[in-house]
């Protein structure tokens, strides 16, 4: 009998009526096989809980904050199970811990360390629809953890991999993956399918998907459908082998999508004596402070000195500066610059690795749009530019036009 893992986001569960609608969709799916449903917190519940915590403390204890935030998904979990039972279905709700999700002890951004699906399998064998709280797990010391914002997607894909499900279906307030953010680019087009490699790059650089969920799907080969919970539309299928299935239209430009991400900040450490170990001396303390560094550029200066520039999330800028100011002294400089109000804009496509001219085409389009490029980074299938945040919408539109992404495949 087929097994499907579904995930429903907070916007799909924001009211009792929406929860009833989701329950009806889950119940209909069970007529064709077994169903496990992963749920996010209702609507803006997580933000409300964060606001409650901030009313108690400016810096809430991470362990206790995880205990608090995990209750949002538990509410949804219980309510969806109640709604299913009201429809006459057999259903059971499980917390992340009850579902066997074991994590590291990094509160607020824990990683899945293991998953024992025995309890879920027992409930499925009893004929139950299993509703699992997303976003959470438990450590070996039995402490509740959360996996980071948006990680209910990861919970769903991890469960699908562990249960060897036929596929994972992620239902949200959008009807699939688009060639760009439709809020920025009105001409953006929904993709019928996309490969894991391209989707991972898009998600990592701003597309509305949890990058770790895509990575999990790629490693364990779990097909992922992204579709609307409000409309009966086909959505976008993310799966292995989609990357190179180029149609005539795709061969025309080989760029599959534009990703954008706001709230980026830049830090530059100037005039560092160029010697072995300076990069490690700077970035190891940042890693120890649990600060993620993205783009790194090293520029050779004069008289044996170098400038190191890197980007972080704007929310991490102040903490980063605390670390960098201390390290800079050890590196023999007191010249540290910072810039906020930046954004990333990227073009992504597996076909770019085999064809020249994409960088120049991108840079020309941005130049013609009056957009200054502050930093550049690339992978085999992606080119990313750092631009001013208030120009990111224009950047996305001119690139979408330059690569003719509005045209059907």
PLM feature spans:
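Nucleotide/pyrophosphate-binding catalytic subdomain
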Residues: 1-214, 218, 311, 387-388, ...
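Glycine-rich beta-alpha junction loops
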Residues: 42, 174-176, 220-224, 228-233, ...
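Short, charged low-complexity intrinsically disordered segments located at boundaries
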Residues: 77-83, 113-114, 151-154, 229-231, ...
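Short glycine/serine/threonine/alanine-rich loop segments
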Residues: 89, 165, 222, 291, ...
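Phosphate/diphosphate-binding glycine-rich loops and adjacent basic-rich segments that engage nucleotide
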Residues: 133, 202-263
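Short hydrophobic alpha-helical runs that function as membrane-insertion/retention elements
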Residues: 167-171, 224-226, 294, 375
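N-terminal short leaders/motifs
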Residues: 168, 214, 221-223, 323-326
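A conserved regulatory-domain signal marking ACT and ACT-like small-molecule sensing domains
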Residues: 237-409
């Amino acid at each position: 009998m087929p097994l499907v893992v579904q995930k429903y986001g907070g916007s799909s569960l924001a009211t009792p009526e929406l929860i009833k609608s989701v329950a009806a969709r889950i119940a209909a799916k069970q007529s064709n096989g077994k169903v496990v449903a992963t749920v996010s917190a209702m609507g803006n519940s997580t933000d409300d809980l964060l606001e409650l915590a901030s009313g108690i403390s400016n810096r809430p204890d991470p362990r206790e904050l995880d205990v608090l935030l995990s209750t949002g998904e538990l509410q949804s979990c219980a309510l969806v199970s109640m709604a299913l039972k009201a429809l006459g279905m057999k259903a059971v709700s499980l917390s992340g811990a009850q579902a066997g999700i074991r994590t590291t002890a990094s509160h607020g951004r824990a990683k899945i360390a293991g998953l024992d699906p025995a309890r879920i399998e027992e409930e499925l064998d009893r004929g139950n629809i299993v509703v699992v709280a997303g976003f959470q797990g438990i450590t070996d010391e039995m402490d509740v953890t959360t996996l980071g914002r948006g990680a209910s997607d990861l919970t769903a894909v991890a469960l699908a991999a562990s249960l060897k499900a036929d596929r994972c279906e992620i239902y949200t307030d959008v009807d699939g993956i688009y060639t760009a953010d439709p809020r920025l680019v009105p001409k953006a087009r929904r993709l019928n399918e996309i490969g894991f490699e391209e989707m991972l790059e898009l998600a990592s650089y701003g597309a509305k998907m949890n990058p770790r969920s895509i990575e999990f799907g790629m490693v364990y080969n779990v097909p992922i459908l992204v579709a609307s919970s409000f409309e009966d539309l086909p959505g976008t299928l993310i799966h292995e082998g989609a990357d190179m299935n180029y149609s005539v239209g795709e061969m025309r430009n080989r760029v599959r999508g534009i990703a954008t991400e706001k709230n980026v900040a830049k830090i530059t450490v100037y005039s560092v004596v160029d010697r072995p170990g300076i990069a490690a001396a700077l970035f190891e303390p940042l890693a120890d402070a649990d600060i993620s560094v993205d783009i790194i550029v090293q520029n050779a200066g004069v008289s044996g000195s170098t400038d190191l520039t890197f980007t972080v999330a704007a929310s991490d800028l102040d903490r980063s500066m605390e670390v960098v100011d201390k390290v800079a002294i050890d590196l023999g400089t007191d010249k540290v610059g910072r810039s906020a109000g930046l954004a990333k804009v990227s073009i992504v496509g597996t076909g770019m690795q085999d064809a020249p001219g994409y960088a120049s085409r991108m840079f020309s389009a941005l130049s013609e749009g009056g957009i200054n490029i502050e930093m550049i980074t690339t992978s085999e299938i992606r080119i990313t530019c750092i631009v001013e945040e208030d120009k990111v919408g224009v950047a996305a539109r001119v690139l979408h036009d330059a690569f003719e992404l509005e045209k059907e495949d």
